[in-house]
């Protein structure tokens, strides 16, 4: 059996506010920042850097929807479902008028503004989030 390839999903930046540009600070006005709590005491909480990592999503076709050759993708936690809609439509070369539905665990359609990271925390299993996509309404 061929091993599934994992690809990094390259989507355009989300509509979130732009990152602030660091400003230049002179040595006289610079004040040292206190160390973060994760750096001071190792606890059960994850460090802040771990929340920025990408998560794996598994995209499965339903019905007569074309199957993607690459099914497993690494996606930023802050990506929205709308970003996935746009990516899948572009990847499958669907016409803008064609509908696309995404379902979590074959049960419900998440809101377009829902972040993938939140869905992963609630419904992810085995280190990945399984999403089903189709061109016609299938569940719920």
Swiss-Prot record:
SUPFAM superfamilies: Ubiquitin-like (SSF54236). There is a cross-link at residue 140 (Glycyl lysine isopeptide (Gly-Lys) (interchain with K-? in acceptor protein)). Keywords: Acetylation, Autophagy, Cytoplasm, Immunity, Innate immunity, Isopeptide bond, Membrane, Ubl conjugation pathway. Its main location: cytoplasm. It is a peripheral membrane protein. InterPro entries: Atg12 (IPR007242), Ubiquitin-like_domsf (IPR029071). It is found in: Cytoplasm; Preautophagosomal structure membrane. This is Ubiquitin-like protein ATG12. It holds the Pfam family APG12. One of its GO terms (biological process) is innate immune response. Shares weak sequence similarity with ubiquitin family, but contains an 'ubiquitin superfold' and the C-terminal Gly is required for isopeptide linkage. Residues 20-42 have a biased composition (Low complexity). Belongs to the ATG12 family. It comes from the Eukaryota. CDD domains: Ubl_ATG12. Residues 1-52 are annotated as: Disordered. Acetylated by EP300. Ubiquitin-like protein involved in autophagy vesicles formation. Conjugation with ATG5 through a ubiquitin-like conjugating system involving also ATG7 as an E1-like activating enzyme and ATG10 as an E2-like conjugating enzyme, is essential for its function. The ATG12-ATG5 conjugate acts as an E3-like enzyme which is required for lipidation of ATG8 family proteins and their association to the vesicle membranes. The ATG12-ATG5 conjugate also negatively regulates the innate antiviral immune response by blocking the type I IFN production pathway through direct association with RARRES3 and MAVS. It comes from Bos taurus (Bovine). One of its GO terms (cellular component) is phagophore assembly site membrane. Transmembrane segments: none annotated. Forms a conjugate with ATG5. Part of the minor complex composed of 4 sets of ATG12-ATG5 and ATG16L1 (400 kDa); this complex interacts with ATG3 leading to disruption of ATG7 interaction and promotion of ATG8-like proteins lipidation. Forms an 800-kDa complex composed of ATG12-ATG5 and ATG16L2. Interacts with DHX58/RIG-1, IFIH1/MDA5 and MAVS/IPS-1 in monomeric form as well as in ATG12-ATG5 conjugate. The interaction with MAVS is further enhanced upon vesicular stomatitis virus (VSV) infection.
């Amino acid at each position: 059996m061929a091993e599934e390839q994992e690809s990094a999903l390259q989507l355009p930046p989300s509509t979130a506010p732009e990152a602030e540009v660091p400003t230049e600070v002179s040595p006289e006005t610079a004040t040292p920042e206190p160390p973060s709590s994760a750096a001071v005491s190792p606890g059960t909480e994850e460090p802040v850097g771990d929340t920025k990592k990408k998560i794996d999503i598994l995209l499965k076709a339903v019905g007569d929807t074309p199957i993607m050759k690459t099914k497993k993708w690494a996606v930023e936690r802050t990506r929205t479902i709308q970003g996935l809609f746009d990516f899948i439509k572009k990847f499958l070369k669907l016409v803008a008028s064609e509908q696309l539905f995404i379902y979590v665990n074959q049960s419900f359609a998440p809101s377009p503004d829902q972040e993938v990271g939140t869905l992963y925390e609630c419904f992810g299993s085995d280190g990945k989030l399984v999403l089903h996509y189709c061109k016609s309404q299938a569940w719920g």
